[in-house]
Amino acid sequence: MSISYNVFDIAVNPTYYSFEKLKLIVEKAKELKILPLFIGLDMETNIQVIHLSKMQQTLCYCGIHPTHINTLYKENNIWNILDIVQADLKQLFVENSEYIIAIGECGLDYYRNQLKIEQQRIFKMQLELSYLNIPYFLHMRNAFDDFYNIIKNYTNVTGVIHSFDGTVDQALALINLGFYIGINGCSLKNNIDLVKNIPIDKILVETDSPFCLIRKSYAGAEYGKVLKVKENEPVYILNLIEIISNIKQMPIQQLIHQFKLNTIKCFPQLKKFQ
């Protein structure tokens, strides 16, 4: 995997595609020097994305997504298995360190899942693995206050808050803690203020394929081409970067170069693709 890439799509959900479709979209992306990075969502999909990363010659993240915590427990037994799940995650990282570049996707989601206490416990359990010196691929939706109050206590945790749809002030507060902000089509749904106002050296770009296309009704749509496709895929990250360049009034190639540097700083294992 020593090929050089120009763009890293930091968020691709491979388990939502058939194997044949995944193979096709990865090949298309790599032809354009785009490397898709795969997301694990729970213990089952973590195993799958490691396997798919090996098959597709890419890298991945492994963790427990806040909306997938129901896969960990029946009734109220979650408190009895946190140590077991933490140990299982650690074993995954140790045994597959060549392919796993971050812990995640993990975080808090109060939009789709109201099990707030359970989410917080599972989030903290994963943050306690920071002694492994692995970056984090983080999720935060409708949960800024609790997310911030938890994450600020883990001063050795680094990484990106992906698919960011919060406010400019929230983004800047997280940037001040040392985090990067992941931008995709959903970040441009209601307004362009976020993209317009956060520094380019703190932005990572993503498609969150097959989700988060920029739709005609989105605020960001007037700054570029709206793709007439049903599903997102990694090659469309170039469309996202073009829209960001129009919003920020900066050359596309300058942004591509900066976003590549940012991603490598966030995930040092990507240095092999410089």
Curated annotation (Swiss-Prot):
A divalent metal cation 1 binds at E105, D208. It holds the Pfam family TatD_DNase. It comes from the Eukaryota. Binds 2 divalent metal cations per subunit. One of its GO terms (cellular component) is cytosol. Coiled coil: none annotated. Keywords: Hydrolase, Metal-binding, Nuclease, Nucleus. It is an enzyme of class 3 (hydrolase). Its EC number is 3.1.21.-. One of its GO terms (molecular function) is 3'-5'-DNA exonuclease activity. It is found in: Nucleus. InterPro entries: DNase_TatD-rel_CS, Metal_Hydrolase, TatD-like, TatD-type_Hydrolase. A divalent metal cation 2 binds at E105, H139, H162. Its main location: nucleus. Its cofactor is a divalent metal cation. Putative deoxyribonuclease. PANTHER family: DEOXYRIBONUCLEASE TATDN1, TATD FAMILY DEOXYRIBONUCLEASE. Belongs to the metallo-dependent hydrolases superfamily. TatD-type hydrolase family. This is Putative deoxyribonuclease TATDN1 homolog. It comes from Enterocytozoon bieneusi (strain H348).
